[in-house]
Amino acid sequence: MASTASNTSKLEKPVSLIWGCELNEQNKTFVFKVSDEDKSEHQLALRTVCLGDKAKDEFHVVEIVPQVEGSDVQPVPIASLKPSILPMATMVGIELTPPVTFRLKAGSGPVYISGQHIALEEDYSWAEEEGEEEVEEEEEEEDPESPPKAVKRPAASKKGSQAKKKKMDKDEEESSEEDSPVKKGKGAGRGRKPAAKK
């Protein structure tokens, strides 16, 4: 949907509705329009054009007739359907601003056109949000001091952690030697292998 910027300070929120119409032998044209009293911006995004189950096996051509006055502008075909070949066409990127006239140029139908009717309604909740933002700004100005942020230290590299581990192992050995009673005599120190008997 192409959105245009509004000159007013009011925000617009989209309201989306499913839309559809039927073209047949009795009703070969359909005009999608909105009331003149409605000040919202409207768009019609087409999604599918499909044949009904009672459609004859003939070509059904659906076209859009421009609303421009003058004979220079030709109708634009948007789908050519036949039940045995192509019973449905998906529309992508066709977004129209009302009024839009659809016409069944060839075939007897029924042909169903569906899409999404999007209306941008004025949103007055912006005034409430703006008031809340002003209150928050005043609270921030009253309490300018904020607690200092904790600074993280960089992680130690592998070399540093290996050296630290060796140092801790050495400290543990020294502390265990200090805590243990001093051994005296021949048993102190390295042990000897008993001699083998002959």
From Swiss-Prot:
It is found in: Nucleus. The record marks D57, K82 as: Interaction between pentamers. One of its GO terms (molecular function) is chromatin binding. Expressed in oocytes. GO terms for biological process: chromatin remodeling; positive regulation of DNA replication; single fertilization. Residues 125-198 are annotated as: Disordered. Belongs to the nucleoplasmin family. Homopentamer. This is Nucleoplasmin.
